Swiss-Prot record:
Residues carrying covalently attached carbohydrate according to the record: N41, N111, N206, N298, N347, N354, N456, N460
GO biological process, any: cell surface receptor signaling pathway
GO CC annotations, alphabetized: leading edge membrane; membrane; plasma membrane; ruffle membrane
Site positions for Cleavage: L517, S518
Secretion signal span: 1-23
Protein's UniProt name: Adhesion G protein-coupled receptor E2
Gene: ADGRE2
Phylogenetic classification of the source organism: Eukaryota, Metazoa, Chordata, Craniata, Vertebrata
Chain spans, region GPS: 482-530
Record-linked Gene3D superfamilies: 2.60.220.50, Laminin, Rhodopsin 7-helix transmembrane proteins
Residues on Extracellular side: 24-540, 591-605, 666-683, 757-760
Record's miscellaneous remark: Has no murine ortholog.
Known function: Cell surface receptor that binds to the chondroitin sulfate moiety of glycosaminoglycan chains and promotes cell attachment. Promotes granulocyte chemotaxis, degranulation and adhesion. In macrophages, promotes the release of inflammatory cytokines, including IL8 and TNF. Signals probably through G-proteins. Is a regulator of mast cell degranulation.
Length: 823
């Protein structure tokens, strides 16, 4: 059915074309030619010029004529230079490129021969094409704007010129003594305020060179008459004259500084002290203050020191005052003298001054402008050395002052003054000393000295000051301390050591280093030095050597004796190994204090090994308790399983965690000056003593409970001999274990008081022979071990006999092999 419809439709289309064909045939041209084509005949068409089709002759109405792009790259059309080809429908045009125009006047042309294009001068057509500070410059086909010198094109607007800031762009060649001043399109090199051009130099061009104006010598300053003009680079300052100080609220070293006379520092008697001698001294001081003139500062200083020297040489009724009041008077004199000398010394001329007086009082002063060096002041009994930069107060332009006054007579008023030590230093002293004697106070060995600077902020110096004291001989078995006088809130004070350390001491001299300034001295404190007992040393080394041998034999026994290997011997083996390593390291490395890092590592290792030893002691006690409990409750296999899971993580893990925490918190406290062990400062030693006390306490409780269980067991037993003997052996081992593994550490902690020496001997003897006791109890007293020793002994003798027989047999064979000799 579909095929029939298609045939009918095709026949209908043919029928429709027949009239046209008849018409074309009648004219001789095809009516179906496509657009932009021309008829050739009744059956063919051809595209018009400027168009093309798939074939040159079109024979079907389905073909089309398309425009030819004559301006395409492969086209033969050539418009010539300065022109562009423009394609049109069926043709093309040549036009001049932008910026060019034809001379002939025709706007389009067809080929290069008709090309008359030439450049258009846009700058001539529009002279204002470029904006301010720009000049139009014609180019082929276009133009550019060139900026005047000192200007540059703005990137976002190529017709606009903006000013170049030569001062910030680094393009100016101004001399370092000048200041660059930017102008529109240019710059100037001008002298700064307080500067002027050198002779022959202009002021403005780039070759300007300037020099500082000395306002002080030229009279251009405005300093007040109470000040002195000081020229500075590019400016000047006004400083107070010697003996003057800035008025209240007005800073010194400014152009508007105004000064007034510096009055004598107020120095009055201490309140609550009644002494005619002291009153006469302060009357002299008040008279000196009323008559004080800045130009007479040198004389005033000498008069004050003379009066103080006389006061301390003959203190009179001051010696009858209670000790506390004498200390208060001394504190008041030291504090006031420092303030007065600091103020008066600022009025002295630059240089080094030394004063000495009959009773031994000395003053050394150095006044200088600030310099970058160290300063050393020397006296008969003391030397002070410090960095000169410490003397200058920030913002104070005046001269720097360093002073050292030695007052030997002050020791009379400071007799029996208390000494207050820092807690850390107190603990450190107790490590090497028995402690302060109950019936003695510190003895003043050296003169009392007082150091002062023009800078009164000396509580925390950026670099320490060093003192070298000469003093009388030190009594043997005493401790020498570098101290300073710390003023109390009640007007008195005490000796202290905060911020001061003893660098070194000999029989008659001591070097001290402090981070602050005050009044200083050297004390001889009544400490009994803990000298090393040679007998204890011999006992320690001999006992530990024997213990090492016994521990090695015990460890080999626990490893090689198959008959006794169980959970108990595993505990014994780990305990023996830890104790062996700890004792060995103690013997060879406890005194290796020369290298701090190595000593710290040794101390940390000893800490771990002894903690591990203690932990295995605890596991031994726990296992002994569980074994005793097993006498009444049959669960031996569960005890073994429990101990096997527990013992290694606890035995080695707990000490490792403890040492790791200690090392992470305070690693610098591993290693002491005398041995590679834990320092007592800040309670660090309790990282070892704490576990010792805890384990000893737990072991004691377990021991008592074990004895109670054994007591009940013994009372319930019948007369069966073997059971009774085994139970008694267990009780004996329990008692021996407490004595060997717990009692020794308890004795070490109890080395205090009158019985300290006895405890030290007991601790040393028992602890050094600990390995011997372990070998005795766990090896020699064990029947199975003795039997194994017997087997090993027989085997060794048998091997020895066989070796001897083999040797004899070899000798006999050698003799028979020799030829006989006939005489």
């Amino acid at each position: 059915m579909g095929g029939r419809v298609f045939l009918v439709f095709l026949a209908f289309c043919v029928w429709l074309t027949l009239p046209g064909a008849e018409t074309q045939d009648s004219r001789g041209c095809a009516r179906w030619c496509p657009q932009d084509s021309s008829c050739v005949n009744a059956t063919a068409c051809r595209c018009n010029p400027g168009f093309s089709s798939f074939s040159e002759i079109i024979t079907t109405p389905m073909e089309t004529c398309d425009d030819i792009n004559e301006c395409a790259t492969l086209s033969k059309v050539s418009c010539g230079k300065f022109s562009d080809c423009w394609n049109t429908e069926g043709s093309y045009d040549c036009v001049c490129s932008p910026g060019y125009e034809p001379v002939s006047g025709a706007k389009t042309f067809k080929n290069e021969s008709e090309n008359t294009c030439q450049d258009v001068d846009e700058c001539q057509q529009n002279p204002r094409l470029c904006k301010s500070y720009g000049t139009c410059v014609n180019t082929l086909g276009s133009y550019t704007c060139q900026c005047l010198p000192g200007f540059k094109l703005k990137p976002e607007d190529p017709k606009l010129c903006t000013d170049v800031n030569e001062c910030t762009s680094g393009q100016n060649p101004c001399h370092s003594s000048t200041h660059c001043l930017n102008n529109v399109g240019s710059y100037q090199c001008r002298c700064r305020p307080g500067w002027q051009p050198i002779p022959g130099s202009p002021n403005g061009p780039n070759n300007t060179v300037c020099e500082d104006v000395d306002e002080c010598s030229s009279g251009q300053h405005q300093c007040d008459s109470s000040t002195v003009c000081f020229n500075t680079v590019g400016s000047y300052s006004c400083r107070c004259r010697p003996g003057w100080k800035p008025r209240h609220g007005i800073p010194n070293n400014q152009k508007d500084t105004v000064c007034e006379d510096m009055t004598f520092s107020t120095w009055t008697p201490p309140p609550g002290v009644h002494s005619q001698t002291l009153s006469r001294f302060f009357d002299k001081v008040q008279d000196l203050g009323r008559d004080y003139k800045p130009g007479l500062a040198n004389n005033t200083i000498q008069s004050i020191l003379q009066a103080l020297d006389e006061l301390l040489e003959a203190p009179g009724d001051l010696e009858t005052l209670p000790r506390l009041q004498q200390h208060c008077v001394a504190s008041h004199l030291l504090d006031g003298l420092e303030d007065v000398l600091r103020g008066l010394s600022k009025n002295l001329s630059n240089g080094l001054l030394n004063f000495s007086y009959p009773a031994g009082t000395e003053l050394s002063l150095e006044v200088q402008k600030q310099v970058d060096r160290s300063v050393t002041l020397r006296q008969n009994q003391a030397v002070m050395q410090l960095d000169w930069n410490q003397a200058q107060k920030s913002g104070d332009p005046g001269p720097s002052v360093v002073g050292l006054v030695s007052i030997p007579g002050m020791g009379k008023l400071l007799a029996e003054a208390p000494l207050v030590l820092e807690p850390e230093k107190q603990m450190l002293l107790h490590e090497t000393h028995q402690g302060l004697l109950q019936d003695g106070s510190p003895i003043l060995l050296s003169d009392v000295i007082s150091a002062f600077l023009s800078n009164n902020d000396t509580q925390n110096l950026s670099s320490p000051v060093t003192f070298t004291f000469s003093h009388r001989s030190v009594i043997p078995r005493q401790k020498v301390l570098c101290v300073f006088w710390e003023h109390g809130q009640n007007g008195c004070g005490h000796w202290a050591t905060t911020g001061c350390s003893t660098i070194g001491t000999r029989d008659t001299s001591t070097i001290c280093r402090c981070t602050h300034l005050s009044s200083f001295a050297v004390l001889m404190a009544h400490y009994d030095v803990q000298e090393e007992d040679p007998v204890l040393t011999v006992i320690t080394y001999m006992g530990l050597s024997v213990s090492l041998l016994c521990l090695l034999l015990a460890a080999l026994t626990f490893l090689l004796c198959k008959a006794i290997q169980n959970t108990s011997t595993s505990l014994h083996l780990q305990l023996s190994l830890c104790l062996f390593l700890a004792h060995l390291l103690f013997l060879v490395a406890i005194d290796q204090t020369g290298h701090k890092v190595l000593c710290s590592i040794i101390a940390g290792t000893l800490h771990y090994l002894y903690l591990a030893t203690l932990t295995w002691m605890l596991l031994e006690a726990l296992y002994l308790f569980l074994t005793a409990r097993n006498l009444t409750v049959v669960n031996y296999s569960s005890i073994n399983r429990f101990m096997k899971k527990l013992m290694f993580p606890v035995g080695y893990g707990v000490p490792a965690v403890t040492v790791a925490i200690s090392a992470a918190s305070r690693p610098h406290l591993y290693g002491t000056p005398s041995r590679c062990w834990l320092q007592p400062e800040k309670g660090f030693i309790w990282g070892f003593l704490g576990p010792v006390c805890a384990i000893f306490s737990v072991n004691l409780v377990l021991f008592l409970v074990t004895l109670w269980i054994l007591k009940n067991r013994l009372s319930s037993l019948n007369s069966e001999v073997s059971t009774l003997r085994n139970t008694r052996m267990l009780a004996f081992k329990a008692t021996a274990q407490l004595f060997i593994l717990g009692c020794t550490w308890c004795l070490g902690i109890l080395q205090v008081g009158p019985a300290a020496r006895v405890m030290a001997y007991l601790f040393t003897i028992i602890n050094s022979l600990q390995g011997v006791f372990i070998f005795l109890v766990y090896c020699l007293l064990s029947q199975q071990v003795r039997e194994q020793y017997g087997k090993w002994s027989k085997g060794i003798r048998k091997l020895k006999t066989e070796s001897e027989m083999h040797t004899l047999s070899s000798s006999a064979k050698a003799d028979t092999s020799k030829p006989s000799t006939v005489n």
